[in-house]
Amino acid sequence: MQQQHHYQQLIDLFDSCFAEEFNTRLIKGDDEPIYLPADDETPYHRIVFAHGFFASALHEISHWCVAGKARREQVDFGYWYCPDGRDAMTQSQFEDVEVKPQAFEWLFCVAAGFPFNVSCDNLEGDVEPDRIAFQRRVHARVMTLLEQGIPERPARFIRALQHYYQTPLLTAKHFPWPEDLH
């Protein structure tokens, strides 16, 4: 089993899975993550992840896997993003949007043998997010995906991760309940 996790591995795996068919490449960025569709200067779509962080790459890939074709033609998939410092209602909306991508991210992490941590992303907000409640929602989504089937793009990437990192097929036992994650 591969023990080292380096962002270049993810770039190579992602590009081998999706560069040709989806004209999309994974790019190490020097700043905040962003998705950029092809334009006059760059003939391919770019998933730019933050600072060479392995976890950031997996998270941004998960958002790409959620986005449909029309969303993949827009900067940052056309999503609204409210930065850190959200109030309770805005935090709730943020978490609603994040459940599905973070479920994919958890699947990717397990397939890569890499630790997963949910991200509520509100360190400076006036509300303390309930990480356990949010992780329960992400966990429930993971269980649904395992039972009903993982869509093609994330499933393809999971297979590539499993092959490279020599990890087993994903089952429910790989995703313990939040109380078990101490």
Named regions from a protein language model:
Residues 66-99, 118-128:
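Post-HEXXH active-site segment of zinc metalloproteases
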Residues 95-110:
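An active-site-proximal "capping" alpha-helix that borders the catalytic cofactor pocket
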Residues 55-68:
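Active-site recognition of the HExxH zinc-binding catalytic motif
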Residues 1-41, 91-96:
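Auxiliary, metal-adjacent structural segments of Zn-dependent hydrolase domains
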Residues 107-122:
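Short helix/loop segments within enzyme catalytic domains
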Residues 3-6, 40-56:
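Short pre-active-site segment immediately N-terminal to the catalytic Zn-binding motif
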Residues 120-182:
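Pan-zinc metallopeptidase signature
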